[in-house]
Amino acid sequence: MKNFLSTSFALSLLFIAGCKNNTTQELVQEAVSPPNAKELMSKSAERLIGLWASGDANMVAGEFTDDAIRVISNPNGAIVGGEAILESFKQTFSEGSDFNNSKIEVGIVETRFVSDDIMIGAGTFKISDTDSVVIESGKWGNVYRYADGDIKFLLESAHATHDLAQITTKEMPSIESSIVSEQLHFEKVQASVANYIKHANAGDAAALAMLFTQDGIQNVASKDGIVMGREQIKSTTTFSEGQVLNANLLGYMDLGNSLAIAWGNWMQVDSASNTSLRGQWGNLFEIKGDTAYVLMESAGRVK
């Protein structure tokens, strides 16, 4: 009988210890579970939709980090820093603005974490007035910083779709010189931009696609939708004879973890028709060895 009681007591202790170990393991698993990119993006989009409808510039600007950048094919250039971003939204929602009392719809095509604290996403947007008439629509490819269980815009690179006939011009505007920076990996990103121009003007789709990471994202005005991966980027890239691309690099930020964002302007001249198009770009790069690969390209045309 004593042996039975001793054995039962020992088994009970083992059972309790086992339960504790299982509980501890579950708690540890919960603690280290990676954040869900899709859920975070959906919540961010829902907040933006609600805050946009409220017309509260301060609240919308609060969705951006203090050092964020907006590249939105604005003729005046990129909008850099929290104060400038707040002012841009005050103008957006001001009386007399086309966007006053407007609403925004956001479509999400792709989202993923690229480091512990950096997330990217790409998709579509549509802005309508109170009568549901579309004011503006287009595509976006944004970079977000993750902190305290949520994400904020670090780089908004969103570009409206325009009719080519409305934005093609006979003017041949000059493109300003690129910046020079001593920040880490800047020269690699600078080389990537130069190679993009080189391969585009050579009409080499294969070489251009190799400038991207294997799972790179391309969101550009010249293509429908969001293009995913090198193979699709290559197969959807076409060139027209007589078109010459030029671009500059006007801003750069090293993000650590072999990631960097950069932005600038581009211009394309058609020598046959003597016309030009211009726009802006805001991209995310991943540095591997001596090369900066495009992890996400997001570029659009300026009206």
Task: List the model feature ranges, each with a label.
Residues 1-8:
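Bacterial N-terminal signal peptides that target proteins for export
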Residues 8-15:
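Bacterial N-terminal signal peptides
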Residues 35, 39-40, 44, 57-117, ...:
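A solvent-exposed, acidic/Ser-Thr-rich amphipathic alpha-helical stretch
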Residues 24-26, 135-170, 278-303:
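Short beta-strand edge/turn micro-motifs at domain boundaries
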Residues 19-62, 162-206, 210:
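Short, low-complexity N-terminal intrinsically disordered segments enriched in polar/charged residues
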Residues 116-125, 257-266:
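A short hydrophobic beta-strand element
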Residues 85, 89, 106-111, 124-127, ...:
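Hydrophobic/aromatic beta-strand elements that line small-molecule binding cavities or substrate pockets
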